[in-house]
Amino acid sequence: MKNNCTSLKSSIDEEDELKTDHEIDLEKGLLPEYDSKEEGALPLYSDHARLSNSPNTHRENNPSRSTDNSSPLLIKLLISFTSIILFNAPAVCYLKYKDAFFKNYGAAEWTLFGFWCLVCTLALIFLTYFYETWTKAVKVTVIFLAQCVKACGKGIKHFLKKWENMPMAFSEVFLFNIFGGALRIISRHFFGKRWGLKCSLADHIIFAILSILVFIAETVKPGSIRVNLIRKMGHEAKQQVNEYTAIPLHEMNPESEA
């Protein structure tokens, strides 16, 4: 029976099997010989060998990134303690100035001092535990204040550059107050205390509003309240000088007449 059995495989299938057995992977190279006697030995290109020889994890490849970047506990404690000392420094300086630092303390003073030490200790623990939170808050606050100061500086610089006549406006408001005060003193002398320095609140408010309006008007448009005689006289003098010193065209070009 064995000799009479014919194989179901065709000649084409046998050729394909021979080709696949003898094919060489150009990327992997020749397959090493597999020794079944060695325990645990697997072909290098098998799935189990790939799993066993898998590359290291991301943490093993990059050990520096796995380290904690947070500040050490000692540095946190030192910075928190320094902030508490700076907070208590004004009180200590005041007690030193009054010569009352640990002098003539009674039961109430020592109780208050112990309570304050307890509060400082709890604050130290709190600041150390929430170090990242409050330091970020302080940084944001400092940056915000710096930006506010910078913006205010730019605004003041722009204001002073644009409103160059503010000193004159201040001086005019000052003169206006002196003139108004003199009138009120004179009116008090002639018409009694009702119109003098002891006026009602409404009179003071009206006088303050008038002073503010004078300042704004003189700042926005110089000479709107006062008559700028100096500038006017200077402008007229320049015009007269230009008229007298102007040279006629025929004197400048005598050849044109000829």
UniProtKB/Swiss-Prot annotation:
Gene Ontology annotations for the cellular component aspect, listed alphabetically: cytoplasm; vacuolar membrane
Topology versus the membrane: Multi-pass membrane protein
Domain of life: Eukaryota
Listed GO biological process terms: meiotic drive
Biological function: Acts as a suppressor component of the dual wtf meiotic drive system, and can suppress but not confer meiotic drive by compatible poisons. Wtf meiotic drive systems promote unequal transmission of alleles from the parental zygote to progeny spores by encoding a poison and an antidote from the same locus; the poison is trans-acting and forms toxic aggregates in all spores within an ascus, wherease the antidote is spore-specific and targets aggregates for degradation by the vacuole.
Region (Disordered): 1-21, 47-69
Species of the source: Schizosaccharomyces pombe (strain 972 / ATCC 24843) (Fission yeast)
Keywords for the protein's UniProt record, in alphabetical order: Membrane, Transmembrane, Transmembrane helix, Vacuole
Compartments where found: Spore membrane; Vacuole membrane
Name of the molecule in the record: Meiotic drive suppressor wtf10
Family: Belongs to the WTF family.
Major location (coarse): membrane
Positions of transmembrane segments: 73-95, 110-132, 169-186, 201-223
Positions with biased composition (Polar residues): 1-10
Quaternary structure and interacting proteins, as annotated: Homomer. Interacts with other proteins that exhibit high sequence similarity.
